[in-house]
C-alpha cells in the first residue's frame, strides 16, 4: 500500500474537478470576469463570520452562483455543496491572522480558510484564475489543457520507465530460477519499481485534477502498471532480512529522497544488508513473487508453501509428493503448482531470447 501524500489537497481537487457542478459554476464566473468569493461550510464558526448579505437558503445550481457572483459580496454554500445559504455577504475573519495575499478577496479567503479550516475559493477578476484555500493549503487551479499536456508527457515517461523495469525484472527472473541473483540485481529491480510508482503517483494527481476529462489517461495508466506495485512489495518480501516487516521496509523505501533512491547501497541497507558488496553477495528469494504468478493459487496456500520450503529453489526442486504434504495443497493443486512454475520458467527463458 502506497503512503498517501497531500491527501487533503487531493480531496479538495476532487470536489472541484471538471465535470462537477461546482467547477461548472466556478468556470462560469471565471468566463464572466466578475470575480467572486465562495466559502464551503455551514457550521456555526462559518456563520459567525457572515455579516449582512441575503439569506437565500436555495438549492445549488451553476447558473445560480454565476448570477449571484455578480454582486460584490461572498457566497456561502453548505459543506455538501447542495445549497446556497448566503449571497452578497461580508465575511469578517480575524484580522490578526497573517496573509501574504494582496487582493481583498484573496486576503479574506485565506483568513477564513485558516480560521475555520474550511474551503474558501477566490476567483480573481483581473488575473482570471481560481485560487483555493483550506487551512494552510493554497492551490491555484490550472487549466485542463495544461494539465492534460503534463499528464500525456508523464504517460510517455512512464512507458519508458516501465520498459526498463520489465527488462530488469526479466533478468532477475532468469537469475532467480538459476539461484544466481545478486544483491545488485534485487536492489536495481526495487529501485526501478519505486521510480515507476512515483511517476504513477504524479499521474494520479493529474487524473484527480482533470476529473471526467482524465478518463483516457486513467485507462492508459491502468494498462501500463497492472500488478507492478504488488510485484514490488512481494520482491521486498522475498529478500528483506528474516526479522524485518516487509511493509515497513516498503514504507521506508517510499520515504527515500530522489537522490537516495539512486544509491543502491541505501536500498540494500533498508532491506537489512549493511556493508555487503552488491555485486558479490548472492541472495536467494523466498518465492512469494514467482509463486504468486501461478494461476488460481490462493494467497494462504502461497503462505503455507513458502513457510514450508523457505526458499524458491526448494519449491522448484520439490516433487508432487513433497508439495502434497503442504497444508492446503492436494494432489491436483500440487500438479498445478509444478506445471505452473514450469510454464513460468519456460516463459522467462523465451523472453531471454527475444
Swiss-Prot record:
PANTHER family: DIADENYLATE CYCLASE, DNA INTEGRITY SCANNING PROTEIN DISA. PROSITE patterns: DAC. Its cofactor is Mg(2+). One of its GO terms (biological process) is DNA repair. InterPro entries: DisA, DisA_sf, DNA_integrity_DisA_N_sf, DNA_integrity_scan_DisA_link, DNA_integrity_scan_DisA_N, DNA_integrity_scanning_protein, RuvA_2-like. This is DNA integrity scanning protein DisA. The gene is disA. Keywords: ATP-binding, DNA damage, DNA repair, DNA-binding, Magnesium, Nucleotide-binding, Nucleotidyltransferase, Transferase. ATP binds at residues 73, 91, 104-108. One of its GO terms (molecular function) is ATP binding. It catalyses: 2 ATP = 3',3'-c-di-AMP + 2 diphosphate. Participates in a DNA-damage check-point that is active prior to asymmetric division when DNA is damaged. DisA forms globular foci that rapidly scan along the chromosomes during sporulation, searching for lesions. When a lesion is present, DisA pauses at the lesion site. This triggers a cellular response that culminates in a temporary block in sporulation initiation. Also has diadenylate cyclase activity, catalyzing the condensation of 2 ATP molecules into cyclic di-AMP (c-di-AMP). c-di-AMP acts as a signaling molecule that couples DNA integrity with progression of sporulation. The rise in c-di-AMP level generated by DisA while scanning the chromosome, operates as a positive signal that advances sporulation; upon encountering a lesion, the DisA focus arrests at the damaged site and halts c-di-AMP synthesis. Residues 6-144 form the DAC domain. Homooctamer. Belongs to the DisA family. Its EC number is 2.7.7.85.
